[in-house]
Amino acid sequence: MTTHSNKTIFQLDHAVFTYPYEEPVLRNISLTIQEGEKVCILGANGCGKSTLLKIFSGLLLPQQGTFAAFENEVTEKKLNDDSFSKAYHKKVGFIFQDSDVQLFCSTVEEEIAFGLLQQGLNRDTVTRRIDDIVKMLEIEHLINKAPFKLSGGEKKKVALASVLAMNPDVLILDEPTNGLDPRTQMWLIRLLDSLGEAGKTIISSTHNLDLVSRISDRAVLFDEDHSIVADEPTRALIQNAELLKAVNLVDESYRV
C-alpha cells in the first residue's frame, strides 16, 4: 500500500454550499485530504458528492467556511487570477461523471493537446506528451477520431488522457465507472491502482459499494441531510450495514 505523507492537499472547515433557491447541499463540512491518499466520497444520489468534488477541483467555492488547497486558502480572487488558475488546474485534474461535458474538440488528438497548450507548453513537448499518454491508455487507434463518435468507454479514456497528460498531483473522479461496461470498469480500476502506487492523490465519488473498496482506502460517508456521518477505512465502513441503510445507500437485503 502506498504510504501517505503529512502534507495536506485539501482542507475544508465548516463549509456550506447552497445553489440558488435550494436547501444547502453541503452542511458544515470539515474534511482533510492528505497527499497520496485514495479517498472515496460515498452517499446516495443528491447528497452533495459532486458539489464537494467541484470545490476540490476549483470550480466552486463554499459560501461559508474556508477551503484550503496545498496548505493555502483558496479564494474567488485567486481563482479569477489567470496564473493561479493555471497552476491550480495543472496540479488538480477532474474527470466529470459525464465525459461529454469535457470533450469539445474535433479530434482526440486536439482534445488531449488543448490543456497542454493552455499551459503554454511548446508543440514538441505537447506531441511527446500525447504520444506517451495514448500509448499508456492504449488509445492510439482513436487519435484522429471525433470524440462525439466514440463509445462511452472510449470517451472516458479520452477524458482521462486529456487530464493525465497534464501529469496532475491530484486526480478527482465523479462516479468514474458510470455507464462503463465490465471490461472497461476493470481497466479503470487497474489504472487507478497503478496511479495510486505512483503516489497520486485520488479522490472519487460513488454510490456503488461493489466498487468503493477497490478504488479507495478511506471512505467519507454523507447522509441525505448533506452532512458527513462517517470517515474511516473503507473496508470497515462497508461492514456497517445499519449505517449504510440509515443513509439510504443500501436496502434491507444488504448483507455484509
Task: List where the protein language model places each region.
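H-loop/switch region of ABC-family ATPase nucleotide-binding domains
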Residues: 206-207
